[in-house]
């Protein structure tokens, strides 16, 4: 049986985590071809999903050390240090895994630099698929890494058509390898199970929030929440009944909380 490995080391429960889980479930359950889907658990970041993976016959590849609970999760610098620790502890285990198991496909969601570098160095007998989420900043290092690895990547997927167009215009990847694939954020079966409320009751609940502005997303620099908070603080000077509700998590959470306290 051919195998598909998922690589998505995560620190917080952001949208990419849900997308990774639902994508793995879909491939395991609905694929026309018989594939064994496995998720790489680098340091214990996927431990809490073990029952879900077992339910859908998704395998878990365990690396030796479990240190996820000790890693700092919030703050830009702290989260970068945590990712660096994961890279250092995963370099040789991931190399050995790819060399020994030779999966048919290797899908990368987060912390993609490590598998990309390994593939550039050793050219494994595996089709590497790069999943690009959000609108990543194309700094010099990232652009160089992507450009140099383009020939070694099997496919590159983008969650939005805007991102796909932007990357095509940058001439970083082979255009024939790129395509649009939406994030698997919603598991339809779970969604149906959770909708147990009466339609009228639901509408009443929504109407009670008509003074709210809602912002949902990962709390990162790319989303520019400081600008939203600053502008809204000016807006409520004349509209005091209005409330901004931000739902999300990420490395900028602490900084945003400090800014909100300052503006209040």
Per-region residue spans from a language model:
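A conserved, positively charged/aromatic
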Residues: 78, 82, 98, 128-158, ...
